[in-house]
């Protein structure tokens, strides 16, 4: 047995399934997960000492690469002053100002400790502000594991093959309406059925938990118009896309102004973090200025704020997002070219620093039902082939891939050469 396999068996004795988040268990691809000991730049290193070119990036946060020297130093400096205070700090003020500077729709910001906490709080705020109960989400979109959101959820819940999770009362789920991502008519139908009951729409502007599905032209604009027409709030969940798709997130990339935005991942520089914010009129409805309650022991934690600020400042460098997008395009288009060369049906999507690939005859994948019909066995074969070649992809056909600024010419060339070899073996 490898060291990773030994650790996995040991972990299963004390941790449910041996992991602290289901997708890490490799259930979607089979085999044993790699236990990671360290990471640097574009590489992660497992417990057996093997290096992998990493396209998971801790599921998105590591946009500058692992163990970035400025982020590491910011954390070390912050630790000198203490780990947590449970009181306001200048760091959280600076973080809020930086977020507002980069995302104009966010006039005020509340820091929390996770993406789930951010979306849960934003929905509570939307319900309180509108005095309505129902929310509208999309099949295949994942917004964390709050009860009201695990209804036909994507990501790990999709991999488990469960449309929702046991333990969620029907009385909770009945207030969550689900529509078809990229199909505006399904949203219109729900608003016509519940014209004065829907508090908000929440969506991933680029669906990154059913692989990578960008919005089709007119979809986001149509949602904005419907929210305005029916008095609902538009919540854009940018936990994944925030500061990864562009300097101002997916909303800046596509030119859409939401009422509320949720953030996470990138704004923590690798530390646990989340945030939600939006129009001042709405944000003033949250305690202590308003009646909607929300609180958190570690909200605005100084270590997370220090790491996040260091990363956010680096992301303001001229030309950074253009370079990141070019790298992402090269990987995605390179996968497509290699698959075509060997007669393997493959469709690709990419935007900013995110990419996805689908084993299907379809030219473009735009909907949840199309994702579920892709060739899962081909994905598993490709995944393990790439893993053997030293390339670490997300261990699920329902997860997006991520590039970082640390991925250089060498890593891109080696990844595409590996893909060519794996596709060649699959074609035999």
UniProtKB/Swiss-Prot annotation:
<comment type="pathway">
    <text>Porphyrin-containing compound metabolism; protoporphyrin-IX biosynthesis; 5-aminolevulinate from L-glutamyl-tRNA(Glu): step 2/2.</text>
</comment>
<dbReference type="InterPro" id="IPR015422">
    <property type="entry name" value="PyrdxlP-dep_Trfase_small"/>
</dbReference>
<feature type="modified residue" description="N6-(pyridoxal phosphate)lysine">
    <location>
        <position position="265"/>
    </location>
</feature>
<keyword id="KW-0627">Porphyrin biosynthesis</keyword>
<protein>
    <recommendedName>
        <fullName>Glutamate-1-semialdehyde 2,1-aminomutase</fullName>
        <ecNumber>5.4.3.8</ecNumber>
    </recommendedName>
</protein>
<dbReference type="GO" id="GO:0030170">
    <property type="term" value="F:pyridoxal phosphate binding"/>
</dbReference>
<comment type="subunit">
    <text>Homodimer.</text>
</comment>
<dbReference type="InterPro" id="IPR015424">
    <property type="entry name" value="PyrdxlP-dep_Trfase"/>
</dbReference>
<keyword id="KW-0663">Pyridoxal phosphate</keyword>
<dbReference type="GO" id="GO:0006782">
    <property type="term" value="P:protoporphyrinogen IX biosynthetic process"/>
</dbReference>
<dbReference type="InterPro" id="IPR015421">
    <property type="entry name" value="PyrdxlP-dep_Trfase_major"/>
</dbReference>
<dbReference type="GO" id="GO:0008483">
    <property type="term" value="F:transaminase activity"/>
</dbReference>
<dbReference type="GO" id="GO:0042286">
    <property type="term" value="F:glutamate-1-semialdehyde 2,1-aminomutase activity"/>
</dbReference>
<dbReference type="InterPro" id="IPR005814">
    <property type="entry name" value="Aminotrans_3"/>
</dbReference>
<dbReference type="Pfam" id="PF00202">
    <property type="entry name" value="Aminotran_3"/>
</dbReference>
<comment type="similarity">
    <text>Belongs to the class-III pyridoxal-phosphate-dependent aminotransferase family. HemL subfamily.</text>
</comment>
<keyword id="KW-0413">Isomerase</keyword>
<dbReference type="InterPro" id="IPR004639">
    <property type="entry name" value="4pyrrol_synth_GluAld_NH2Trfase"/>
</dbReference>
<dbReference type="GO" id="GO:0005737">
    <property type="term" value="C:cytoplasm"/>
</dbReference>
<dbReference type="InterPro" id="IPR049704">
    <property type="entry name" value="Aminotrans_3_PPA_site"/>
</dbReference>
<keyword id="KW-0963">Cytoplasm</keyword>
């Amino acid at each position: 047995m490898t060291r990773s396999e030994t650790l996995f068996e040991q972990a299963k004795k004390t941790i449910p399934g041996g992991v602290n988040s289901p997708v890490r268990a490799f259930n979607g691809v089979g085999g044993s997960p790699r236990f990671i000991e360290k990471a640097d730049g574009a590489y992660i290193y497992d417990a057996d000492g093997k290096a992998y070119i990493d396209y998971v990036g801790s599921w998105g946060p590591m946009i500058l690469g692992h163990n970035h020297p400025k982020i590491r130093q910011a954390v070390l400096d912050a630790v000198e002053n203490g780990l947590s205070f449970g009181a306001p700090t200048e760091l959280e003020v600076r973080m809020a100002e930086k977020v507002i500077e980069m995302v104009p729709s966010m006039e005020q910001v509340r820091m929390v400790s996770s993406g789930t906490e951010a979306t849960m709080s934003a929905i509570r705020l939307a319900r309180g502000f509108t005095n309505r109960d129902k929310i509208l989400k999309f099949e295949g979109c994942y917004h964390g594991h709050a009860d009201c959101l695990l209804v036909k959820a994507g990501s790990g819940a999709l991999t488990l093959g469960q449309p929702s999770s046991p333990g969620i009362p029907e009385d909770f789920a009945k207030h969550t309406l689900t529509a078809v991502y990229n199909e505006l008519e399904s949203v219109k139908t729900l608003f016509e059925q519940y014209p004065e009951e829907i508090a908000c729409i929440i969506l991933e502007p680029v669906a990154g938990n059913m692989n990578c599905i960008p919005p089709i032209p007119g979809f986001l604009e149509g949602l904005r118009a419907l929210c305005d027409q029916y008095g609902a709030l538009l919540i854009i969940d940018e936990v994944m896309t925030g500061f990864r798709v562009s300097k101002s997130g997916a909303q800046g990339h596509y030119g859409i102004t939401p009422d509320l935005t949720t953030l996470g991942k990138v704004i923590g520089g690798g530390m646990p973090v989340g945030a939600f914010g939006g129009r001042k009129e709405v944000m003033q409805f949250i305690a202590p200025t308003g009646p909607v309650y929300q609180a958190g022991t570690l909200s605005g934690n100084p270590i997370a704020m220090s790491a996040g600020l260091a990363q956010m400042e680096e992301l303001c460098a001229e030309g950074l997002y253009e370079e990141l997008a070019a790298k992402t395009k090269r990987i995605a288009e390179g996968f497509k070219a290699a698959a075509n060369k060997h007669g393997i049906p493959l469709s690709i999507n990419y935007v900013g620093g995110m990419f996805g690939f689908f084993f299907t005859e379809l030219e473009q994948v735009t909907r949840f039902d199309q994702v579920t019909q892709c060739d899962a066995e081909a994905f598993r074969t490709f995944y393990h082939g790439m893993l053997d070649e030293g390339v670490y992809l997300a261990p699920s056909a329902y997860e997006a891939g991520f590039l970082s600024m640390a991925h250089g010419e060498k890593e891109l060339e080696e990844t595409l050469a590996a893909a060519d070899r794996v596709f060649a073996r699959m074609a035999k």
